[in-house]
């Protein structure tokens, strides 16, 4: 089985590299992204996470579907404060299929529905069921970006964009108040980030998420200590 997968990987790799280079060239030319938490480097990292998870899952994933969904899953990305944000991934999936049809005419049309579903289902706010291994892997790979050291960096970067406070100075640990991650960045760790491992769809994704969530919990503990000690 391992030998077969290695053979399949090496047969796929030239095609994957070809399409990846085309996608990156297009994005560098046509995709201006002011939100640096969702820039081209984010797409590179999500793709890397996809490869890592796919390599450990027993079900074979179509790597071209994964590659395409990874690099275009934020083609439409509405701000967290936008009331229509829950529809962002659907709009993104629609735009991606349209783009592939118009700009990448040699892209295999038979996998367009799989690309559409993976992109549509990846979003946390959309709450769409994943019906393919590619959708499950992409969702986990993207959520991994919210955990670990990178997750902390992106958390406070995004909080700065939104004009949020770092924490509630009167009650930073939220012992006597309701958590409010719209106003306090530190609250987002408990509101969402520490819950992410339980939402992972793949076994390997959950294992990775649990490790990175522990890192975030250690960070929160240390930050609270620095805030509260005299």
Residue ranges of predicted features:
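Short, positively charged and aromatic/hydrophobic N-terminal segments
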Residues: 7-10
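Divalent metal-dependent phosphate-bond-processing catalytic cores, especially two-metal-ion Mg2+/Mn2+ enzymes
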Residues: 12-15, 31-40, 44, 48-58, ...
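Short alpha-helical hairpin
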Residues: 13-28
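His-Asp-centered metal-binding catalytic motifs of divalent-metal-dependent phosphohydrolases/nucleases
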Residues: 61-82, 88, 92, 96, ...
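Short, well-structured alpha-helical segments
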Residues: 40, 44, 63, 67, ...
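Hydrophobic, well-structured mid-protein blocks that either form specific transmembrane helices
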Residues: 99, 103-136
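An amphipathic alpha-helix signature
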Residues: 20, 24, 47, 89-97, ...
């Amino acid at each position: 089985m391992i030998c077969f997968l290695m053979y399949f990987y090496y047969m796929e790799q030239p095609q994957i590299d070809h399409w990846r280079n085309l996608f990156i060239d297009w994005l560098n030319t046509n995709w201006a992204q002011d939100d640096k938490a969702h820039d081209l480097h984010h797409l590179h990292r999500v793709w890397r996470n996809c490869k890592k998870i796919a390599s450990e899952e027993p079900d074979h994933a179509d790597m071209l579907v994964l590659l395409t969904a990874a690099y275009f899953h934020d083609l439409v990305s509405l701000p967290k404060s936008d009331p229509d944000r829950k529809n962002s991934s659907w709009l993104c999936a629609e735009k991606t299929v349209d783009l592939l049809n118009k700009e990448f005419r040699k892209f295999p049309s038979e996998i367009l529905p799989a690309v559409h579903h993976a992109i549509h289902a990846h979003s946390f706010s959309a709450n769409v069921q994943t019906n393919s291994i590619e959708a499950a892997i992409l969702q986990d790979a993207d959520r991994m970006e919210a955990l670990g050291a990178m997750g902390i960096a992106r958390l406070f970067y995004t909080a700065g964009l939104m004009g949020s406070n770092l924490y509630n100075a009167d009650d930073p640990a939220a012992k006597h108040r309701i958590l409010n991650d719209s106003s306090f960045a530190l609250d987002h760790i408990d509101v969402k980030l520490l819950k992410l491992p339980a939402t992972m769809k793949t076994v390997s994704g959950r294992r990775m998420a649990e490790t990175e969530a522990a890192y975030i919990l250690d960070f929160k503990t240390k930050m609270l200590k620095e805030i509260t000690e005299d």
